[in-house]
Amino acid sequence: MFSFDLSERRSGRYEGVNGIFTCPVPTTSTKREEMKTSLRGSAETLLPSGPQITMVSSSTTVDASGLSYGGNTLLGLGADRDPERSAKLGGNKSQESERSAENAQTVKRNPQVTERPDSEQQPQIYPWMTKLHMNHESEGKRSRTSYTRYQTLELEKEFHFNRYLSRRRRIEIAHNLCLNERQIKIWFQNRRMKWKKDSKIKVKE
C-alpha cells in the first residue's frame, strides 16, 4: 500500500506484527529490489518456520499443534509443557470413572434398597383401628364350653353325691368324660353357685 505525502515523495506503509510503521520508497529499480530483499529477510527473521497463530492484541504466539486456555490443557501443548499436571488430571479422571462404575455396581447388586416393596408402601393398620368392628368380648376371654347331654348327666350325678371334688376324683371324671381338669372345676363352681341361690330362695319362701 502506497501513499503520497506533502513533499511529493512516495512512502510505503508496512504493517508489522506488533504495530504499523512507514518507510520511504526509493525511486530507482535497484533500490526497490534491495528494499524488497531486505524486507523479505526481516520478515523471515520475525516469523520463524512452522505453523503459528499470531495474536496482535496480546503479543503472544501459540503453536498450532496445541492451544492453552486459562491454564487448562485443550489439545496437547499443555501436556508437553507440564507433564505432572496432565498426569494428575488423568489420574483424577480415572478415579472418577472407577467411582462411578462402583456406584453402578452397588445399585445393581442392591435393588431392594432403592425400590421399596409393596408392603411398606401400604399404610400400616393398627389394632385400635379395627377394634370397633370386633366383638365386644374382652381380649383373652376363652370361648364358652358346651357340654353334651351325657356329660351333663354324669356331672349332675357326681354333684348330687359330692359338692366338692378332690383333685384325684376331678382328674378321673375329666378322663372319663373327655374333658380337662379346668372344665370340671369350673362346672362344679357354677353348679354350687346355682345350688346356693336356689337354697336361699327356698328358705325365703
UniProtKB/Swiss-Prot annotation:
Pfam families: Homeodomain. SUPFAM superfamilies: Homeodomain-like. It is found in: Nucleus. Its main location: nucleus. GO terms for molecular function: DNA-binding transcription factor activity, RNA polymerase II-specific; RNA polymerase II cis-regulatory region sequence-specific DNA binding. Residues 140-199 bind DNA. A motif (Antp-type hexapeptide) lies at residues 125-130. InterPro entries: Antp_homeobox_Deformed_sf, HD, HD_metazoa, Homeobox_antennapedia, Homeobox_Antennapedia_CS, Homeobox_CS, Homeodomain-like_sf. Keywords: Developmental protein, DNA-binding, Homeobox, Nucleus, Transcription, Transcription regulation. One of its GO terms (biological process) is embryonic skeletal system morphogenesis. Residues 102-113 have a biased composition (Polar residues). Residues 75-123 are annotated as: Disordered. One of its GO terms (cellular component) is nucleoplasm. Belongs to the Antp homeobox family. Sequence-specific transcription factor which is part of a developmental regulatory system that provides cells with specific positional identities on the anterior-posterior axis. This is Homeobox protein Hox-C5a. The lineage of its organism: Eukaryota, Metazoa, Chordata, Craniata, Vertebrata.
